[in-house]
């Protein structure tokens, strides 16, 4: 449990704090945090949500915490012009799931790359999966 929270929550905060001075110097800075739809509190509050039964204190709760941290970043940075967005790569084959995901890491990275490359007029404050499909917070 600690390793998952260290990666998904505390590690993200440490990188954010370390990189913020550099991001503040950029005219087109952005933060793209990688979460999961299973971290959506809105979805998990619905007993009909397919992943509702698996919501627990390790992975899903760590992603819900990451979502909250991302929201805090958005609030902190809203007057700076730094874009902050959250993406879900989907059920991607990784070491965490024993490579049992339904898609390759190349496909899982599509939304991360799309959001990272948004133009200066692109949105901030979004939570999306591939093809800009909105995920409820």
Residue ranges and their predicted role:
Residues 16-17, 71:
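A short, exposed helix-loop element centered on a Lys and neighboring polar residues
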Residues 37-39, 92-93, 97:
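Conserved sequence/active-site signature of Rossmann-fold short-chain dehydrogenase/reductase
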Residues 1-5, 24-78:
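Catalytic loop of short-chain dehydrogenase/reductase
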Residues 64, 79, 86-87, 94, ...:
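C-terminal helical subdomain
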């Amino acid at each position: 449990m600690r390793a998952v929270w260290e990666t998904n929550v505390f590690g993200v905060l440490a990188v954010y704090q370390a990189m913020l001075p550099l991001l503040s110097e950029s005219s087109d800075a952005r933060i793209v945090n990688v979460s999961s739809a299973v971290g959506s509190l809105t979805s998990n509050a619905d007993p009909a949500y397919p992943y509702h039964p698996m919501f627990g204190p390790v992975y899903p709760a760590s992603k819900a915490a990451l979502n909250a941290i991302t929201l805090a970043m958005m609030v902190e940075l809203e007057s700076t012009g730094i874009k902050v967005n959250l993406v879900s790569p989907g059920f991607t084959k990784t070491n965490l799931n024993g490579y049992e995901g339904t898609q390759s890491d190349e496909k899982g990275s599509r939304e991360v790359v799309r959001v990272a490359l948004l133009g200066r007029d692109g949105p901030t404050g979004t939570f999306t999966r591939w093809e800009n499909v909105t995920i409820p917070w």
